[in-house]
């Protein structure tokens, strides 16, 4: 089992808030575009409520921080397009390899 280093854990905690903020900004932009459509107000309201309920479950919005889950969390953030693989370039090579294995099923 892969052990997350203290420096990777610290870096993850420093980065996650910014990544989530950027992702939520993209969501808000999508909501604004959607709300600007010509659909009926009731249709927009209920569709928006459905979108928000779904989006709240995305790790780009809500994530429980556990040191042991960092490789899996990074993979989930990549798979849900919250971040790109390049965004984890500051992390250790070992962690990048672990995430690469989870996301792509192979080592670098």
Predicted regions and their residues:
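Acidic, Ser/Pro/Thr-rich low-complexity regulatory regions
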Residues: 1-108
């Amino acid at each position: 089992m892969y052990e997350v280093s203290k420096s990777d854990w610290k870096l993850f905690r420093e980065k996650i808030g910014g990544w989530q903020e950027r992702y939520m900004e993209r969501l808000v932009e999508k909501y604004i575009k959607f709300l600007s459509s010509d659909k009926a107000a009731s249709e927009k309201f209920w569709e928006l409520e459905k979108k928000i309920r779904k989006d709240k479950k995305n790790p780009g919005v809500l994530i429980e921080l556990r040191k042991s889950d960092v490789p899996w969390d990074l993979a989930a953030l990549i798979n849900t397009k919250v971040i790109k693989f390049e965004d984890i370039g500051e992390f250790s090579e070992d962690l990048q390899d672990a995430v690469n294995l989870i996301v792509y099923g192979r080592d670098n």
